Amino acid sequence: MPKMKTHRGSAKRFKKTGSGKLKRSHAYTSHLFANKSQKQKRKLRKSAVVSAGDFKRIKQQLANIK
């Protein structure tokens, strides 16, 4: 059985927290800010936690991330 390899794209997008959850950044933050309200832009700056349904799938891609 070959070794599990870490999906490098996922490794760059997700970070593990101290409690074992996965942090991610929000989408819609690269351009077109004139159409977004100040409140929306402020909320997009903060990081978010990966939902439970996605966590199982992403955890397999991040096999060797401590």
From Swiss-Prot:
Keyword entries, A-Z: Ribonucleoprotein, Ribosomal protein
Gene3D superfamilies per the UniProt record, alphabetical: 4.10.410.60
GO BP, sorted A to Z: translation
InterPro entries according to UniProt: Ribosomal_bL35, Ribosomal_bL35-like, Ribosomal_bL35_CS, Ribosomal_bL35_sf
GO molecular function: structural constituent of ribosome
Biased composition (Basic residues): 1-26
PANTHER family hit by this protein: 54S RIBOSOMAL PROTEIN BL35M, LARGE RIBOSOMAL SUBUNIT PROTEIN BL35M
HAMAP family per record: Ribosomal_bL35 (MF_00514)
Name this protein carries in UniProt: Large ribosomal subunit protein bL35
